[in-house]
Amino acid sequence: MTPTLAFCHFPFRKELMEIQEYRKARGYDGIEWSLDGWRLMMARGQRRHALDRLRTASPVCSLHAPYTDLEIGHRDTEHATAACRILRDYVDAAAELGAHHVNIHVGTFAPDPDELSNDNLVRNLAVLMEYAQHRGVQLTVENLRGGPSSEPESFAALLRQTGVPVTFDVGHARGCAWVQEGRGSVVDFLRAIPTPILASHIYLIERDDTHFAPQTVEDLAPTLDALIAAGCDFWVLELHSLKALEQTRGVVDQYLASR
């Protein structure tokens, strides 16, 4: 299996021409548009124009939905329902773009347990999944470094309750307390996931909201082996700087060439 190789636009901010030129020059298959700081416009004409520009920059893409102020599992049902409604717009955008998938967060920024409602989370995730299916879009949820998706047991419980597929974030898994405290490895975390892994965010580790690049193939090889074994064929190199992106791409290229 040769994975589809994409990168997140972070190093280039919103410079679409630079993003397009870099994608072509470096032979990437696609781009993940991370929209937390890049919201969709309400006016239909302006939204259509913005999506056309993203499509021109890369016909192959995935979307990372906003998360900073949206929580479908919030204990405040009004907030959770509103977040679910807003995220439907990003499912619509993914449908219009023909995106590979749209990825969401749950339990962002490791809220206190009493800030979340599992009932609201499961109900709203089911609503979003049904809507995504209606629109012909694959919806994924991502493991985070903190919160309910940061430990295999609680994450797997949510996945079993909902059947939602996963974007497996390698750096979040390596940076979470479960791995850092030696209770298991990144590969152990990955293998505990009971639903399909449709995509992966590839980098070494997240610390203080920064994504760090691997230095050698050995840093990532066991995890990449496990992703391939799991059938995950959409890899997003999610780095914040061009230097880190280039370093990670070199490691991934070396890994793929050795197979």
Give the residues covered by each predicted segment:
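N-terminal pre-domain/capping segments
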Residues: 1-91, 95, 164-165, 255-259
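Hydrophobic faces of well-ordered beta-strands that scaffold small-molecule active sites
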Residues: 3-9, 31-33, 61-65, 102-104, ...
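Acidic-and-aromatic substrate-binding clefts and catalytic sites of carbohydrate-active enzymes
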Residues: 8-18, 34-49, 71-74, 109-114, ...
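Active-site acidic/histidine proton-transfer and metal-coordination neighborhood
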Residues: 73-166, 218-221
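Acidic/histidine-rich catalytic cores of soluble enzymes
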Residues: 131-217
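C-terminal helical cap(s) of enzyme catalytic domains, especially alpha/beta-barrels
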Residues: 244-259
